[in-house]
C-alpha cells in the first residue's frame, strides 16, 4: 500500500511504477485526505506515460483502517505521514516506512499544483525509490 495526501499525484505514480517493477506484488494506493474518485493528476500522468508506465485506470480513494490492516507494507512519501499513520493506526506502526527509505530516507515532496519541472523531479525520485524497493522483494 502506497500513501500520500490526495492519492492523485505521488502515490498512484508509485503504485504504477512499483507494480511494473515488481509484478509479483499486489500494489495499491490511497490518500490521507484523498480527492476521492478523481483520476491521476494530468502532470503525473504525463510523466508516467512519457517514461513507459500506464497512467490509466486510477480512481483516488481514502485511506481507512481496513486498507491499513490488509496491507503487508505501507509506504509513505514524508515523515509527517509516517507519524500520522502511526498515531492513527498504532497497530500498523511496524509496517509503515518511507518510500525513500533505501535512498537515505528521502522524503518525496508533494508536486500538486506546481510546475512540470517539480513533477519531473518527483517522478525521478519515485522511480528510484521504487527500483530500490523492487530489489528487496
What are these regions (language model features)?
Residues 1-70, 135:
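Conserved active-site segments centered on acidic
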Residues 73, 79-137:
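Phosphate-binding/catalytic loops
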Residues 2, 76-77:
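Short beta-strand scaffold positions
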